[in-house]
Amino acid sequence: MKYRGFFIVVLLFGLGFSAKAQSDYFFPPNARFDKSIPTPEEYLGYPIGTLHTRHDAIVGYLRELARRSPRARLDTIGETYEHRQLVVLTVSSSANLNNLENIRRKHLELVDPTKTITDFSDQKSIVMLGYNVHGNEPSSSESALLTAYYYVAGLHAEVRQALDEAVLLIDPAFNPDGRDRHSTWANAYQGNPLVSDPVDAEHNEAWPGGRTNHYWYDLNRDWLPLAHVESQARIDFYHKWYPNVVTDFHEMGTNSTYFFEPTKPFGSENPVVPRDNYDGLNNLFAGYFHEALDEIGSLYFTKEQYDNSYPGYGSTYPDIHGALGLVFEQASSRGHLQDSRMGKVAFAFTIKNHLTSSLATVRASVAEKATLLAHMENYFDSAQKEGEQAGGGWVFGDPYDDGRNQAFVDLLLRHKIKTIALNEDISLGDKTFKKRKAYYVPNAQGQYRMVRTMFEKVTTFYDSIFYDASAWTAALAYNMPYEQYNGRNELRGAVLKRSDLQGEYASVPRAEYAYLIEWNEYYAPKALNYLLDKGLYVNSAFKPFSIETHEGVREFGYGTLMIPVARQEANSNLVHAYIEEATEIAGVKAYAVSSGYSASGIDLGSGSFETIQKPQVLMLIGPGTSSYEAGEVWHLLDSKVGLPITKVWKDNVGRIDWSQYNTLVLVSGNYSSLGENTINRIKQWVREGGTLITLRSATSWAVASGLVNGKFAEGPKRETPERMDYATARDFRGSNAIGGSMYM
């Protein structure tokens, strides 16, 4: 009866309850507020939960709180690809905000193994309340507004104590672009009266949905690789503060209830994180969560599903930085009201649960302040000692690709991992690492556990069932040559800062014959695309050679770009200017040559040089295709190459003029709707010289449809099906899937 009554309140509220009724519904009964501070409803013009709030309105309300109250300060920490602001509202007592920089500096002593702190009484709990990394899980951003109001306007004793003892960093939306994509859809299809039927358009947003960012990337997997601007801005802010507690709010299937940590024991836990994080802090905070949710009658579950192993989530990255990362999952209304097996799930109800957990998180962070601060100090102190005991470290470096080196070093430095540029050659195993292209990461540092995360190959697991990724060795992801160094003497070199990363670019003298650019450079395609855009003829070497350059005789490998000067329509001065611009933009090096006669191998006029045709790329997208893979291709060509890609909904394939394109990309998906005529047209296009690129399941479709010749190896078959218990079916399916794996 309590549960049904709860939903009736939500439904009445959704029809336009008063501001007081809204406050009574969302907040604890003892809450008192400063009437000079506007409620979210007063600012927005509608009660929270009756519409999905646009990101600009979220930012506007937080800015208004900061303008009105000495308890709040709003900072812009970055912006999305679509130029939406990434903001953090810092909330604390006015005295703390006036002393904020000193509080921050004092707090950072906890992560410095050279400092010892025994008295935490004047320290503050730093609590990062993070919301809405998946844009179509929108309830948490709404709860962020209520959380901000609660602590900025609250007058009761609990709020005053929290503001005295803690600094709250409220990040209302990790993924504003995805959120607005979803919010626009949900608001556009909202009915009056509300339609709770799960098949209604409101509850089934169009491809690609709002879960992901502008490039259709799941930002909740990006805390480790930092591929996107939102994550880069957030990680910079994270390391400015090193919060003690970080929340990560999500939504799950409508027919579920509510989840909070602890996660599934052992099998879903990261091997480098000390046990006291899971056995101690997780269980300690769980007590606060269940008490708060019990108080409002919400159903929940713990210790099932979900993952603490992959370190690139918003709830796991903090664990590897001496903090407590916390994931919360709420059954989604995916709109404003939806039927479920337990009744109707209203948007306001989902918001209230996340608000309740937010307040409980702050309550626990204040009550357990000494425990959290001691945990963080001990974490980095023990990491330093473990690293010193392990000794040595890791040496890496690609002798041929400085762009790759720079990108990987940049990732390490963003994660505050000490990295040294070696000033002498070193041989380890079967590899020789050359100075100026060799780097060393010592184990003896406070970030030792992050060092392990980036370099160690974890091949032994407690459980064979993974929620998501099963491998995350970053050095392998970069295809980086590396070896473990076990020497007793520390290797010498310059400790790097991000400002030291300059790339290979160096001004090249003007050539009258040709310029050469090595293709093994990570960003060579970017330079190539720039030159093609400028109308230059560029050739590619299909055989190696060596030749006299402005820096003496050098060897050049397969794919080397050769830009002859004489055959260009532009004069030699303009060609030189384009070469300078291209190499500076891409961070690669060009070589000037004065003769086409090689020292060995092919000459520059050889038929083994092929003229490169500028790619005109087409990719089919839309329902039935993988938005994740399509987004990866799009982001790669946009950010790494600067090459435009035409994205066409596969239902519009009949409108394509195939003569305008020379490259077709098919990501995983169902292409059965293309039909025989389209398949035959693609076959003809390939015969005429078009390049077809298929990813994953699209390759199977291409073979099955006769676009390409090929066959696949068959896996083992069971002659007699094995009987299984229904209770183990889910785990059995999971044991046959390996997510996020790396094959070496």
Predicted regions and their residues:
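Active-site cavity-forming subdomains of large catalytic enzyme subunits
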Residues: 184-205, 224, 228-231, 243, ...
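Aromatic- and acidic-residue-enriched carbohydrate-binding clefts of CAZyme catalytic domains
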Residues: 198-217, 269
